[in-house]
């Protein structure tokens, strides 16, 4: 039984840490990555989130120069809530193909749509950063402000 719990924990760590893989033949068009955290000091709890989105252009197949472009859009949104008694993790990954170039989406819109307990109102405001190139890992979380949060740097 203890070994089964360890395997579940290892799978959870792998799932949390591995990014969505890109096709090496695709050309990077757009990318965005955002990270942040909120501390609820009165509850000794915290929420962290990570969001990445990338859009690539698939190469035109040989002999089909008149075909419409095909965009591959990959999105990954993760949240983790930690308190002395609770650990909750959530992850959503979306992969889509389209003939129109998708818009980059801010993480805040996803974070605001994440269900919360009645006693956990959303009071933080995200100050996002955008990247024009491929997603890069940031060692610093973005700054958040709000009544129940503390600025992080």
Curated annotation (Swiss-Prot):
Q: Name one Pfam family in it.
A: Luteo_Vpg
From what superkingdom does this record's organism come? Viruses
Region entry Disordered, spans: 1-24, 121-153
Amino-acid biosynthesis as a keyword of this entry, yes or no, is no
- Biased region (Polar residues) positions are 121-138
InterPro entries in alphabetical order: Luteo_VPG
Keyword field: Transport, Viral movement protein
Q: Give GO terms for biological process.
A: transport of virus in host, cell to cell
Q: Which family is this sequence assigned to?
A: Belongs to the luteoviruses movement protein family.
- What does the record give as the function of this protein? Transports viral genome to neighboring plant cells directly through plasmosdesmata, without any budding. The movement protein allows efficient cell to cell propagation, by bypassing the host cell wall barrier.
Q: What is this protein called?
A: Movement protein
Identify the species of origin: Barley yellow dwarf virus (isolate P-PAV) (BYDV)
């Amino acid at each position: 039984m203890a070994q089964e719990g360890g395997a579940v924990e290892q799978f959870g760590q792998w799932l949390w840490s591995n990014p969505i893989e890109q096709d090496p033949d695709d050309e990077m068009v757009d990318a965005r990555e955002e990270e942040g955290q909120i501390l609820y000091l009165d509850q000794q709890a915290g929420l962290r989130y990570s969001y990445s989105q990338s859009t690539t252009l698939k190469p035109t197949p040989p002999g089909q120069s008149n075909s419409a472009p095909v965009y591959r859009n990959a999105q990954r949104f993760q949240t983790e809530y930690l308190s002395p008694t609770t650990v909750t993790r959530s992850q959503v990954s979306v992969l889509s193909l389209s003939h129109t170039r998708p818009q980059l989406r801010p993480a805040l819109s996803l974070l605001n749509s994440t269900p919360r307990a009645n006693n956990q109102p959303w009071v933080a405001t995200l100050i996002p950063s955008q990247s024009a190139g491929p997603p890069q890992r940031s060692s610093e979380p973005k700054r958040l402000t709000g009544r129940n949060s503390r600025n992080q740097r």
